[in-house]
Amino acid sequence: MMTMKARLGMAFDFKKEYKEFYLPKNTPSIVTVPSMNYIAVRGQGDPNEEDGTYKQAIGLLYGIAFTIKMSKLGDHRIEGYFDYVVPPLEGFWWQNGVAGIDYAHKEAFRWISVIRLPDFVTKADFDWAVEEAARKKKTDFSKVEFLTYDEGLCVQCMHIGPYDDEPDTVERMHRYMEEQGYTLDISDQRLHHEIYLSDARRVAPEKLKTVIRHPIRKG
């Protein structure tokens, strides 16, 4: 269904339309996140490594994201398409043998880097975008996948500041979660989740805004 903003010629912005998922307060809260589809690339290693696999993955994600967004200018027609702002970069993070995240050992990170897809994008549309991006950019997009993730019940909080200070925010989230009668439920299927609202290349570390989300269960 076309949104009112799309009918008025305004680009749909997921951050503004779904504030409960993208713009929480900097105090912890409980949220139930529905199933969403993503462009995804899996990898491992330190995300700060120059020209490393993480930075390469981000390039692949945006290559597909903008191919889909700009499909309106080409011959491929996506049913139900409306103009939108490409959603922010997100990441699911874990380390083998570690409960949660050990920020002191970034080289051990394993991750799934993702960008949300609008609901109107089908797997067939995604496959077209991968082929189209590979053809136009002469780049190998074979690592990119269509991922459906049902996150469910979570505790989340807006973290403002450097990424290395995230443990303080996570501690507040866990304390709030326990006070509300919930238990942390991180597993191989339910992961530490971050949504990056700031461009770290252009924003001072103390002003970076990152949504942190952890899966939980009742009791």
Report each predicted region and the residues it spans.
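A solvent-exposed interaction/effector surface
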Residues: 3-219
